[in-house]
């Protein structure tokens, strides 16, 4: 196995290819990315055997922006028999037992790309999972006692008779099948954008810290808040929110008593002096470098402690623009000797944008 399969949003294959190539090169691993436009995935082929596994261990998955999953895979297995797809898969894994401890495997995920064309294939994958899991367990696999240090087996179907066979490391992969969290839209939320912030909180904030980082003693500012999709996520966690927008906020949010509507320009708004702001969130539709400059100002001036914001990416050179924006923020914080934690991700509920999280340390 000398390849990586990486999933992404359809249309972002080139950005992911550039990112994985850059990360691999930084580790002294060379190869090339196979890109099919709008396919929803990238195959990165290493020149040397064993280097794909090295990348799957050494590249910190949470530091990849455009990848939804990181899997070591085989060559594409084609022409699988409709009558028996399982036997060739079992046989392939048997051939890998000398280099892959399959007794450390904890689960099997049967997946496909997240595209409109693959929706019918996704239904097949769900049905195929049960008999395949049973067959793998008969081999003594999928029984790892320590799940965190184990591996997950992956079958990535590109067609009903063609698949990549592989594995990922449980301590360095996305925790959801296909890298997609299944979130339900809350009926009382003012807009569907609420799912973007919910996913961001679930992704960036450890579950055991959420209650201490979001509660009734915390204050937040939501720039460009109207009609209140992001404000809703903060209020439901007890946070008091200064909702900044010339537009109207949802009546249901006013009724909570946990917001103050500030009908102002998000770029000109200044935090109230009578309380310290814990969180700044921002989903304004604006040039990404202008947003990066605004967020930098809030952090450098100490107006907030943590922030989650989106950078819109309508331009062609999206990965380059992301790099420039993040570097712009990092340079300003480093210049002031401010310690910080930064993560960026193209979340499932993001479209032509990425979500960035920064915490001052």
From Swiss-Prot:
Positions that bind S-adenosyl-L-methionine: 193, 226-229, 245, 265, 283
Active site: 312
InterPro entries xrefs: RlmM_FDX, RlmM_THUMP-like, RNA_MeTrfase_FtsJ_dom, rRNA_MeTrfase_M, SAM-dependent_MTases_sf
Main location: cytoplasm
A Pfam family the protein falls into: RlmM_FDX
UniProt keyword Transmembrane helix, yes or no: no
Biological processes, Gene Ontology terms: methylation; rRNA processing
UniProt catalytic activity: cytidine(2498) in 23S rRNA + S-adenosyl-L-methionine = 2'-O-methylcytidine(2498) in 23S rRNA + S-adenosyl-L-homocysteine + H(+)
Gene Ontology cellular-component annotations: cytoplasm
Alphabetized UniProt keyword annotations: Cytoplasm, Methyltransferase, rRNA processing, S-adenosyl-L-methionine, Transferase
The enzyme's E.C. designation: 2.1.1.186
Xref: SUPFAM superfamilies: S-adenosyl-L-methionine-dependent methyltransferases
A GO term for molecular function: S-adenosylmethionine-dependent methyltransferase activity
Intracellular or extracellular location(s): Cytoplasm
Subunit structure: Monomer.
HAMAP family named in the record: 23SrRNA_methyltr_M (MF_01551)
Described purpose of this protein according to its UniProt entry: Catalyzes the 2'-O-methylation at nucleotide C2498 in 23S rRNA.
Family per record: Belongs to the class I-like SAM-binding methyltransferase superfamily. RNA methyltransferase RlmE family. RlmM subfamily.
Stated name of the protein: Ribosomal RNA large subunit methyltransferase M
Gene name of the record: rlmM
């Amino acid at each position: 196995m000398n390849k990586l399969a990486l999933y992404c949003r359809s249309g972002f294959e080139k950005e992911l290819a550039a990112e994985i190539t850059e990360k691999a090169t930084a580790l002294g691993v060379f190869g090339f990315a196979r890109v099919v436009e709008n396919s929803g995935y990238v195959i990165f082929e290493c020149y040397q055997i064993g280097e794909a596994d090295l990348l799957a261990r050494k590249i910190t998955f949470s530091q990849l922006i455009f990848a939804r999953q990181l899997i070591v895979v085989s060559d594409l297995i084609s022409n699988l028999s409709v009558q028996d797809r399982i036997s060739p898969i079992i046989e392939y894994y048997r051939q890998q037992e000398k280099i892959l401890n399959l007794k450390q495997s904890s689960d099997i995920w049967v997946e496909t790309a997240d595209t409109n064309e693959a929706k019918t294939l996704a239904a097949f994958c769900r049905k195929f999972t049960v008999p395949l899991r049973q067959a793998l367990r008969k081999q003594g696999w999928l029984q790892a006692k320590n799940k965190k240090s184990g591996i997950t087996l992956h079958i990535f179907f590109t067609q009903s008779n063609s698949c990549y066979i592989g594995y990922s490391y449980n301590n360095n992969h996305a925790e959801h099948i296909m890298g997609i969290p299944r979130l339900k839209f809350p009926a009382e939320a003012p807009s569907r954008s609420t799912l973007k912030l919910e996913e961001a909180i679930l992704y960036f904030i450890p579950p055991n810290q959420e209650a201490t980082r979001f509660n009734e003693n915390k204050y937040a500012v939501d720039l460009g808040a109207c009609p209140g999709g992001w404000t809703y996520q903060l209020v439901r966690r007890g946070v008091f929110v200064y909702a900044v927008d010339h537009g109207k906020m949802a009546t249901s949010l006013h009724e909570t008593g946990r917001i103050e509507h500030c009908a102002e320009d998000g770029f000109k708004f200044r935090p109230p002096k009578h309380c310290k702001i814990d969180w700044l969130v921002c989903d304004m539709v604006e040039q990404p470098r202008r947003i990066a400059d605004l967020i930098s100002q809030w952090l450098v001036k100490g107006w907030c402690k943590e922030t989650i914001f989106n950078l819109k990416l309508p331009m062609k050179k999206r990965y380059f623009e992301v790099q420039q924006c993040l570097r712009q923020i990092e340079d300003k914080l480093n210049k002031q000797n401010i310690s910080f934690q930064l993560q960026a991700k193209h979340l499932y509920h993001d479209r032509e944008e990425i979500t960035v999280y920064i915490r001052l340390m």
